[in-house]
């Protein structure tokens, strides 16, 4: 058993160099994403299991495309991968093609042509850290019953969780030819028979390079910070993708506390001047999608003032 009481003694600079070397070894990295504003595609557990299995099948079909993480939501997906651009595009096209077949077979034909977006190339180490954190908290943002460490439909919950990875490494179940043909209406996937499954789907442990992705972070504490506290980086990615994400009171409060100390030289929001509160309220409203009630709670600002600034729709 790993001793989690032992703290890393590797100097910060050396840790960063190791992470940078890992990023360079990956080659070209990409963020595959589909439109957030889209009708419901996956609505049942069987739908989500089919989605998980399809990602696994595409990983087998494209062994030169390395999946670092992914999450499947009811109406959109996010994946972080490495590989040559044309192969990554072909991977994404296969995913969309067979998902359309699955939906048609369940009497819910949906045109997914809007999903064929050009993947966004990841620019540097900091960018890929932010993308992985963004993906691994995406399901948590849309499902209040989950956390970034428990949402079931993706690779997120296996990060820095060796016990769960070990548990998912053992299975007596596997995908059958009958299931593949019935689910995806094709004989082309017969070669994927025998993939081990847990509770009806292929575990991400068997087809995602989670250990490689973990080495892009200095340690588990660094990863936890990126997922749970670094909301400014998350907001930047959302703006680039044209997505809207929402934050909890605690996340927004941590952001405001940081602004109080760095820009206004006070320790707590109640100590801000009224003008400073109004300026921060605009940032929270326009950049972080905070509603008036959230802003009122965090900044101790009168709700009537906020309703006049941002009239309820």
Enumerate the predicted regions with their spans.
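Short Pro-Cys-Gly-centered "Cys-loop" motif that presents a nucleophilic cysteine in a tight turn
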Residues: 1-74, 84-313
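Histidine-centered divalent metal-coordination motifs
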Residues: 76-78
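Short hydrophobic/aromatic beta-strand micro-patches
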Residues: 80-82
